[in-house]
UniProtKB/Swiss-Prot annotation:
<dbReference type="InterPro" id="IPR022903">
    <property type="entry name" value="GCS_T_bac"/>
</dbReference>
<dbReference type="GO" id="GO:0005960">
    <property type="term" value="C:glycine cleavage complex"/>
</dbReference>
<keyword id="KW-0808">Transferase</keyword>
<dbReference type="InterPro" id="IPR006222">
    <property type="entry name" value="GCV_T_N"/>
</dbReference>
<dbReference type="Pfam" id="PF08669">
    <property type="entry name" value="GCV_T_C"/>
</dbReference>
<dbReference type="InterPro" id="IPR028896">
    <property type="entry name" value="GcvT/YgfZ/DmdA"/>
</dbReference>
<dbReference type="InterPro" id="IPR027266">
    <property type="entry name" value="TrmE/GcvT_dom1"/>
</dbReference>
<dbReference type="InterPro" id="IPR006223">
    <property type="entry name" value="GCS_T"/>
</dbReference>
<keyword id="KW-0032">Aminotransferase</keyword>
<dbReference type="GO" id="GO:0004047">
    <property type="term" value="F:aminomethyltransferase activity"/>
</dbReference>
<dbReference type="Pfam" id="PF01571">
    <property type="entry name" value="GCV_T"/>
</dbReference>
<comment type="function">
    <text>The glycine cleavage system catalyzes the degradation of glycine.</text>
</comment>
<dbReference type="InterPro" id="IPR029043">
    <property type="entry name" value="GcvT/YgfZ_C"/>
</dbReference>
<protein>
    <recommendedName>
        <fullName>Aminomethyltransferase</fullName>
        <ecNumber>2.1.2.10</ecNumber>
    </recommendedName>
</protein>
<dbReference type="GO" id="GO:0019464">
    <property type="term" value="P:glycine decarboxylation via glycine cleavage system"/>
</dbReference>
<dbReference type="InterPro" id="IPR013977">
    <property type="entry name" value="GCST_C"/>
</dbReference>
<dbReference type="GO" id="GO:0008483">
    <property type="term" value="F:transaminase activity"/>
</dbReference>
């Protein structure tokens, strides 16, 4: 089957990227090596081609009120220049996908209209887009594919902001986490949508720009010594930060309460949204499972769907697992009954027929100082 390629595909290969198939795209899994890339983001700066992600522009009359029908988070908490993380839900309160919603403020063409930018996961982009269009598109509201021939680039790490300030001549000290702005970067033709967001547990930005500018910025960042990073390091970085991966740590059969995302559910707001009734019942009854952090003894790595054992019985499953390059030990996220989700609970994970001791620990495993 033919794979989609991002506008940075050839540049990734030229930079040493080892390409793999991911969610219908040919993407770099690593460049210099997972460990080196992971360390670069934790100590300096790294960049990721994330142009496979879906990007939608919702523009028209009262887009927040319209999108509010689909998410449990109060969208009126954010204003122009701000963003929030949330989830799309089905009628059962299960998670269809997670997403970031950016408020771009009044439309440039019609000040009576407003604009939202929505970033969705690559694997869910087609179904998410159809779902959102089904419920939102009307005469005075459009849902547009914003990413066509565009580049989405993540620049992450403790030195990322300083580098971007130097390349743009701008002071970003007042740009808060989940804030966004339009930035002029030296040598690029058009202003760059710049959001202080990321999927690594480090400070940094995600940049949306036209293909030609994206290619130029990639080369510029390489010349500045920024480490190109692949999907492998992106996964170990997000796992250390206990950030969810859709399809592993949550899915359409998992509610936000079961995924440890109850803080996204604002039942105190009056707005009706798909799945609200199911979540009201779930909030009253309490979740039947919880997402927890595990640290394992030894060096064996727990992978997705490995059984979690307690007193000889299977009590849950690992949702994500890896070796932690920062902590130098195996870590995992797992779904367990609430009674076993308490910190310090000792369990085992079955790895290739052997039981490996594990302990429930606090999430995230890593938090930047």
């Amino acid at each position: 089957m033919d794979q989609n390629c991002t506008p940075l595909h050839d540049l990734c290969i030229a930079a040493g990227g080892r390409m793999v198939s991911f969610a219908g795209w040919e993407m770099p899994v690593q460049f210099s090596g997972l460990m080196a890339e992971h360390k670069a983001v934790r100590s300096d700066s790294g960049m990721f081609d994330i142009s496979h992600m879906g990007v939608l522009r919702i523009e028209g009359a009262n887009p927040k009120d319209a999108l509010q029908q689909l998410v449990p988070s109060d969208l009126h908490r954010i204003g122009p220049g701000q963003a929030c993380y949330s989830v799309l839900l089905n009628e059962q309160g299960g998670i269809i996908d997670d997403l970031i919603i950016y408020d771009l403020g009044p439309s440039l063409l019609d000040e009576s209209h407003e604009t939202l930018l929505v970033v969705i996961n690559a694997a869910c982009a087609e179904t998410d887009t159809a779902w959102i269009r089904q419920h939102l598109e009307r005469a005075d509201l459009q849902v547009l594919d914003e990413k066509k021939d565009g580049v989405l680039l993540a620049l992450q790490g403790p030195k990322a902001i300083g580098l971007l300030e130097r390349l743009s001549g701008s002071d970003l000290s007042e740009l808060p986490r989940f804030g966004h702005c339009s930035l002029n970067i030296h040598g690029l033709q058009a202003p760059v949508f710049t959001a202080r967001t990321g999927y690594t547990g480090e400070d940094g930005v995600e940049l949306l720009l036209k293909a030609d500018d994206g290619r130029q910025l990639w080369q510029l960042l390489l010349e500045e010594g920024v480490t190109p990073c692949g999907l492998g390091a992106r996964d170990t970085l997000r796992l250390e930060a206990a950030m969810h991966l859709y399809g592993q740590d949550m899915d359409a059969a998992t509610t936000p309460f079961e995924a440890g995302l109850g803080w996204l559910v604002h039942l105190e707001m009056p707005a009706l949204f798909i799945g609200r009734q199911a979540l009201e019942q779930a909030a009253e009854q309490g979740p039947s499972k919880r997402l927890v952090g595990l640290k394992l003894q030894g060096r064996s790595i727990a992978r997705h769907d490995y059984p979690v054992i307690h007193n000889g019985a299977t009590v849950g499953v690992v949702t994500s697992g890896s070796w932690s390059p920062t902590l130098q030990e195996p870590i995992a996220l797992a779904s367990l009954p609430p009674a076993l989700a308490k910190l310090g609970t000792e369990l085992s994970v079955e790895i290739r027929g052997q039981l490996q001791p594990a302990t429930v620990v606090k999430r995230p495993f890593y938090r930047r100082s």
